[in-house]
A protein has these predicted regions:
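N-terminal Lys/Arg-rich, disordered targeting/topogenic segments
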Residues: 1-20
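Hydrophobic membrane-insertion alpha-helices, especially the h-region
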Residues: 21-39
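Short, surface-exposed "cap/lid" segments of acyl-processing enzymes
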Residues: 45-94, 98-102
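Alpha/beta-hydrolase active-site loop
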Residues: 107-129, 135-136, 144-148
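Catalytic nucleophile serine of serine hydrolases
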Residues: 139-141, 168
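A conserved short beta-strand
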Residues: 156-172
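The feature captures the conserved acid-bearing segment of alpha/beta-hydrolase catalytic domains
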Residues: 168-169, 173-227, 231
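C-terminal catalytic histidine-bearing segment of alpha/beta-hydrolase fold enzymes
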Residues: 219, 224-254
Length: 254
């Protein structure tokens, strides 16, 4: 029978109280390392801002030549509902240029930098082979930044944008993303002024019945279509319902 290792012998000789403390220390260290690894995975420490998800099949005739730009929420494009929403659009035949908002806004951006990110993403999508027009989709924090950027979209790009889809946008803007918004701090400005100025294309605004700080109920312009889903800001985490609603908006053309 093999003899116990030095570490095993030492643990056996350690009083139970100290042994428990040592085990708890190891468990705490494992939790910290796990949390750091998770934050790295979702993109808080850096990584690609853009990810292209090709269409999984041929697009329906009406959507041919159209790509989607998708801005994730503040938990990034690799977790939560975002990956399901992105893949659902691609599975229906539309390529998606996904933006990891957590990575893009991990450091506070100026309003002008936020605007330029939306412009750059639009141009990137339009430069993809075969793409002639784009649909712009934002989720939560991504919806906030999207509407702010679209409000001042250059005139040269406007004719090539089919519509804007805002999923659970808030009534305030913060130009910095932290996981789940826990470290965001106070809002930088109200969301309504920029959102109200988007009067040149169709806008679909999706919100939950129990949301308390939603932008959607504040929008009454003729070009805005509001859609209400069950739940609060997280919509009961029902990615299938939200992805179906987004695709219905895409098929409607606004």
């Amino acid at each position: 029978m093999p003899s116990p290792s030095p570490l095993a012998r030492r643990m056996a000789e350690t009083p139970p109280r100290r042994r428990f403390g040592f085990v708890m220390l190891l468990a705490g260290l494992a939790l910290v390392l796990g949390a750091i690894g998770y934050l790295g995975y979702i993109g808080w420490f850096g990584g690609p801002v853009y990810r292209l998800v090709p269409a999984a099949r041929a697009a329906p005739p009406r959507e041919r030549g159209v790509a989607a730009v998708f801005l994730s929420g503040d938990s990034g494009a690799n977790t939560g509902m975002a990956p399901h929403l992105i893949q659902a659009i691609a599975d229906r035949g539309m390529p998606v240029l996904a933006i990891n908002s957590l990575t893009a806004f991990a450091h506070r951006r100026t309003p002008e930098q936020a605007r330029m990110l939306i412009v750059e993403a639009t141009r990137r999508a339009l430069a993809l082979p075969g793409v002639q027009r784009v649909v712009l989709v934002g989720q939560s924090f991504g919806a906030d930044m999207l509407q702010f950027g679209v409000a001042t979209m250059p005139a040269s790009l406007r004719p090539r944008i089919v519509q804007v889809i805002l999923a659970v946008p808030g009534d305030s803007l913060v130009f910095k993303a932290t996981p789940g918004g826990f470290l965001d701090g106070p809002p930088d400005r109200a969301a309504l002024p920029s959102a109200r100025s988007i009067d040149w294309l169709p806008v679909t605004c999706i919100h939950g019945t129990q949301e308390e700080n939603s932008l959607c109920p504040l929008l009454h312009a003729h070009n805005v279509r509001r859609v209400t889903l069950p739940g609060d800001h997280y919509l009961h985490h029902d990615a299938a319902a939200l992805s179906a609603t987004i695709w219905q908006a895409i098929r409607r053309g606004g």
